[in-house]
A protein has these predicted regions:
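Loop/turn elements at helix/coil->beta-strand transitions in domains of secreted/extracellular proteins
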Residues: 60-62, 94-97, 121, 148
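Short loop/turn microsegments at loop-to-beta-strand junctions
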Residues: 40-41, 63, 140-142
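Non-globular targeting/processing and membrane-anchoring segments
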Residues: 177-183
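Thiol/disulfide oxidoreductase modules built on the thioredoxin-like
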Residues: 113-119, 126-172
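Structural microenvironment flanking redox-active thiols in thiol-disulfide oxidoreductases
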Residues: 76-117, 130-133
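N-terminal "domain-start" segment that seeds a small globular fold
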Residues: 27-55
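Short active-site neighborhood of thiol/selenol oxidoreductases, capturing the structured segment around
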Residues: 54-76
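Bacterial Sec-dependent N-terminal signal peptides
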Residues: 1-29
Length: 183
């Protein structure tokens, strides 16, 4: 192989590595079925055993939806932080609602999981992925924030400290704005 061929191969590899992140983003976009600015998909869910509600029942509140599974390591990193940094701050605020849905898991797994972890926020079943399928085709954890008008204002896939800090900052800013407006 001559010098020219070697340089051409190195240039090709450099371009390939530069384009690799875009392939990853495209895959994420394909797995996400909703977009920021969309109306939240309508769905009913069991808020407690035997009691059905609809997501539209919570219109007028800032809603955080978390899609997770008990076996998911990033989910198990994120949820204790949600407990401390979001739920303990806003859980008793009437203008805030938070729902964690266990993908492919029922009450039989979720109740003991919640008790073992010491979580005080609602962890609810999504045994058939019916709720998950409204938002995505794959990948957890996912967080979706819905504003008081039922519009999606934030979505994330996976867990990173930076992404989580940004989500907390958005919730803080939104809740402070509501407090100033007296809502």
């Amino acid at each position: 192989m001559n010098l020219h061929q070697t340089v051409m191969k190195l240039n090709f590899l450099a371009i390939l590595f530069m384009l690799l992140p875009f392939a990853s983003v495209a895959q994420e976009d394909q797995s996400t079925l909703t977009k920021v600015g969309d109306d939240v998909p309508q769905f009913a869910f069991e808020i407690e055993k035997g009691k059905q509600v609809n997501i539209s029942d919570y219109k007028g509140k800032l809603i955080l939806i978390n899609l997770f599974a008990t076996w998911c390591p990033p989910c198990n990193t994120e949820l204790p932080l949600v407990q401390k940094q979001i739920w303990e701050k806003y859980g008793s605020n009437g203008g805030f609602a938070f729902f964690v849905f266990g993908r492919e898991e029922g009450w039989d797994k979720l109740i003991p999981y919640k008790e073992k972890k010491g979580f005080t926020f609602p962890i609810l079943p999504d045994a058939d992925r019916g709720i998950f399928k409204k938002f995505a085709t794959q990948s957890i954890p996912r967080n979706i924030i819905v504003d008081e008008n039922g519009k999606i204002i934030y979505q994330s896939i996976g867990y990173t400290e930076k992404e989580f800090a940004g989500m907390v900052a958005l919730i803080d800013a939104h809740m402070q704005k509501k407090q100033v407006q007296g809502k």
